[in-house]
């Protein structure tokens, strides 16, 4: 019995619980359906309200657009009416103009008819006058036309020649003025040292006893110094001085410096001489390179081959007519650069060509060519621009200049060399040049005496008034000047002045 209770009671409880759960679920479902139905009804009402609101807004928008369209239509109709009124006014004005043009056309037709009538009359008169002119002049119309053309042609040629001469004169004056302006501007901008160092070859001695020490026992010291440096040491009767002679300026400088140091040191023997010479040689070699680099830096020139730099540096120890060649080359480069900038040429090419124009004087070679040819070969070897090579070779007209920069280098070289005080001659050459100048003038027939004055810049010639007349003086002066140009070399120009004096003496008794 008990087991029945234990089995049936739980079963009844389970069934009762499931039934209660089912009934609760049905109740919940019914409530959810009612809530959903209520929400749906509310949504339908809201949708209807929004629909009515949208329809109302749409109607209001349509009404506004209709009013806007009507307003625009009224404005367009108003514009169209105004346009039609203006068009009507223009048509009225055009009709008036057409009437005016028609009247003018009729008037022109009348005038044209009158002109045609007058033209016929004038043509007849012209033919009659032409026949009368031909009868009076004895020339046909074609002959008269040819005569007039010839006269006009001659007059036109004369006018053309006059105009051409005027243009040539103006061009010459303009060119001279422009050249003067360029040179004046260049010289005003040029600021270089006018005084150059004198490369001396005389070594001062503390006393004449030092000469014996320099010579050494059986001349071994002087032989060692001459052998190591390649110079000639001249010891003569000149008190307290020794002369160093050599054609190579660098070797002469090495010998001079080495000799001065030996004298200062006091130890003079072959071993010491060799040591000093080697040391000075290294120092001079370094100085050569430094001088070359210095001038390149001063001029703003870059990318120069080392061989070219050394050749430039060697010019520091070389002089020409007392002018330092490196300083001269630097000055020529500055002048060439200024001229090139004034006329629009290549400044870099002009400066390089001007700086290297005398580089052949510093080249280490035994060639018998002149310095322009040697310099041109050196410029080719160091891979310079062909225009630079041409400028170097053509600066003394040994070859034909092929570019404007070569001509600029020639001009700059002439300016630097001709500048007063830039160069000087030795006394012997100076006296000889003056003597040659006077002898050349005295070789002409009728010349009594010639005097070279103002350092050879002027030649005054006294002539015999019985052999040379006033009319012949101009010819003689020109002949003397031409012979000076052909036979002598001189800087600048020489003024030839002829003096012819006639003295007539009479006595009254």
Curated annotation (Swiss-Prot):
SMART domains: HDc, KH. Pfam families: HD, KH_1, RNase_Y_N. Residues 199-284 form the KH domain. Signal peptide: none annotated. GO terms for molecular function: RNA binding; RNA endonuclease activity. One of its GO terms (cellular component) is plasma membrane. Its EC number is 3.1.-.-. GO terms for biological process: mRNA catabolic process. It is a single-pass membrane protein. It is an enzyme of class 3 (hydrolase). Residues 325-418 form the HD domain. SUPFAM superfamilies: Eukaryotic type KH-domain (KH-domain type I) (SSF54791), HD-domain/PDEase-like (SSF109604). It comes from the Bacteria. Disulfide bonds: none annotated. Keywords: Cell membrane, Endonuclease, Hydrolase, Membrane, Nuclease, RNA-binding, Transmembrane, Transmembrane helix. It is found in: Cell membrane. The chain crosses the membrane at residues 3-23. Belongs to the RNase Y family. HAMAP family: RNase_Y (MF_00335). Endoribonuclease that initiates mRNA decay. PANTHER family: RIBONUCLEASE Y. This is Ribonuclease Y. It comes from Treponema denticola (strain ATCC 35405 / DSM 14222 / CIP 103919 / JCM 8153 / KCTC 15104).
């Amino acid at each position: 019995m008990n087991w029945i209770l234990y089995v049936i009671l739980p079963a009844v409880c389970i069934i009762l619980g499931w039934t209660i759960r089912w009934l609760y679920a049905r109740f919940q479902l019914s409530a959810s359906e009612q809530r959903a139905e209520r929400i749906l009804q509310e949504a339908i009402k809201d949708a209807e309200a929004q629909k009515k609101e949208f329809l109302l807004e749409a109607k209001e928008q349509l009404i506004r657009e209709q009013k806007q369209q009507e307003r625009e239509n009224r404005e367009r109709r108003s514009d169209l009416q105004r346009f039609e009124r203006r068009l009507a006014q223009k048509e009225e004005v055009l009709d008036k103009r057409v009437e005016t043009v028609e009247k003018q056309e009729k008037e022109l037709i009348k005038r044209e008819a009158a002109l045609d009538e007058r033209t016929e009359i004038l043509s007849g008169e012209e033919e009659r006058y032409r026949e009368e002119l031909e009868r009076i002049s004895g020339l046909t119309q074609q002959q008269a036309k040819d005569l007039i053309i010839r006269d006009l042609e001659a007059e036109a040629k004369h006018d053309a020649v006059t105009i051409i001469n005027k243009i040539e004169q103006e061009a010459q004056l303009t060119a001279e003025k422009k050249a003067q302006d360029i040179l004046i501007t260049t010289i005003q901008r040029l600021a270089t040292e006018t005084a150059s160092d004198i490369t001396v070859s005389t070594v001062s001695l503390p006393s004449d006893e030092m000469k014996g020490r320099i010579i050494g026992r059986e001349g071994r010291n002087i032989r060692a110094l001459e052998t190591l440096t390649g110079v000639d040491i001249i010891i003569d009767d000149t008190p307290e001085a020794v002369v160093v002679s050599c054609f190579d300026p660098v070797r002469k400088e090495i010998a001079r410096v080495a000799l001065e140091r030996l004298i200062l040191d006091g130890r003079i023997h072959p071993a010491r001489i060799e040591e000093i010479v080697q040391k000075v040689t290294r120092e001079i070699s370094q100085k050569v390179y430094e001088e070359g680099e210095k001038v390149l830096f001063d001029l703003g020139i870059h990318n120069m081959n080392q061989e070219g730099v050394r050749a430039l540096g060697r010019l520091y120890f070389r002089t020409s007519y007392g002018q330092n060649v490196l300083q001269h080359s630097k000055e020529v480069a500055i002048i060439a650069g200024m001229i090139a900038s004034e006329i629009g040429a290549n400044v870099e090419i002009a400066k390089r060509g001007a700086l290297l124009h005398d580089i052949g004087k510093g080249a280490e070679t035994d060639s018998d060519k002149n310095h322009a040819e040697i310099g041109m070969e050196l410029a080719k070897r160091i891979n310079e621009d062909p225009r630079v090579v041409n400028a170097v070779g053509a600066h003394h007209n040994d070859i034909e200049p092929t570019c404007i920069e070569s001509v600029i280098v020639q001009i700059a070289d002439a300016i630097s060399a001709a500048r007063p005080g830039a160069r000087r001659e030795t006394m012997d050459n100076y006296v000889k040049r003056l003597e040659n100048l006077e002898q050349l003038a005295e070789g002409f027939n009728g010349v009594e005496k010639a005097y070279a004055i103002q350092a050879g810049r002027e030649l005054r010639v006294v002539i015999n008034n019985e052999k040379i007349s006033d009319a012949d003086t101009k010819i003689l002066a020109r002949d003397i000047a031409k012979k000076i140009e052909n036979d002598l070399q001189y800087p600048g120009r020489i003024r030839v002045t002829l003096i012819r004096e006639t003295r007539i003496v009479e006595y009254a008794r």
